[in-house]
Amino acid sequence: KCRFHGVCLNMKKLFFVFLCLLISESYKVNAQKNSTKYSEDYYNATEWRNIGPFRGGRSAAVTGVAGKANLFYFGSTGGGVWRTTDAGNTWENISDGFFGGSVGSVAVSEWDNNVIYVGNGEKTVRGNVSSGDGIWKSVNAGKTWEPMGLKNARHIPRVRIHPKNPDIVFAGVMGDLYKSSEDRGVYKSTNGGKTWSKKLFANKDAGVVDLIIDPNNSRVLY
């Protein structure tokens, strides 16, 4: 039993504080010993890579190529344009670095398979829908791409190419999905997409979702 009660209590408090400080310092020393320092050169040497998920989103655009049974292209709403040369066993992206992910249509010229037109902006009307930035064209089977106008179209569900002249192209434009738009309608280019002229416009609330060229008469469109 302590004769000096106040002194005993203070000694206990001091001992407790000392013990806490000792444990804290011991933890800091061990943490410093176990921590590993990395040079900035280590991080500068690393490269970004895609580790998944390996999913490009839903697809509303796909096409084969006449005379080439194993060659196909598809456009996704969140992953750009993809190509397979082995009937779908493997796929490679051919649009990364050129344009955005949302694709509404893909068309390959029957006359020259190296010529590809892509209409950006998906056509699946839903709560979360991605718009695009017009028409893109490749003349080397997807190695490189160039923008070909119609940037305000937002959604291009269909592109059709003349069967014997890849410079004659038709584009069906849906336009803005949620408001009236003067950009809707059917457009035609006769110079490979350099310029476009509007050939059909019903009204600012009626967009185009599909186009068909008559296989027996390329002057007839539906």
In which residue ranges do the predicted regions lie?
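Bacterial Sec-dependent N-terminal signal peptides
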Residues: 1-34
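Beta-propeller blade termini and top-face loops
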Residues: 32-222
